[in-house]
């Protein structure tokens, strides 16, 4: 996700549209800002989950939450990068197209997003008031 963002950012800074750099168009700038937010949230989720696992806790719920949050965020980031870059984003001219294609599978590996959400929903239903779920 970070590599695709860096490439899209560089493209948006250099590419001109309607007399100004793409980055100066609000829609493009907002997409790149959303990427930064998703990247930081993903980093924090991974660090949090790693801390839970390092403490010796099973981390089943935390792992599912992190897997869903990060894989969905990476998909959004890759999608925005393709959008920012237009046709170049889906061409072989940069690795953004490859990243976009490969990141899609992250939502399936180790259980699809929907299976993890189903598992989380069951945990929420079983939880007692004050418990984590």
Name these PLM-found stretches.
Residues 1-133:
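Alpha-helical interface subdomain recognition
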């Amino acid at each position: 996700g970070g590599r695709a963002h860096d490439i899209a950012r560089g493209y948006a800074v250099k590419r001109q549209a309607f007399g100004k750099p793409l980055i100066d168009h609000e829609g493009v700038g907002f997409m790149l800002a959303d990427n930064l937010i998703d990247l930081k949230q993903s980093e924090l989720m991974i660090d949090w989950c790693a801390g839970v696992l390092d403490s010796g806790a099973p981390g089943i719920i935390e792992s599912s939450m992190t897997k869903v949050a990060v894989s969905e965020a990476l998909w959004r980031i890759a999608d925005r990068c393709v959008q920012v870059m237009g046709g170049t984003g889906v061409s072989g001219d940069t690795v953004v197209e490859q990243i976009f294609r490969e990141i899609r599978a992250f939502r399936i590996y180790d259980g699809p997003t929907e299976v993890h959400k189903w598992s989380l929903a069951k945990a929420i239903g079983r939880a007692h008031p004050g418990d984590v779920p």
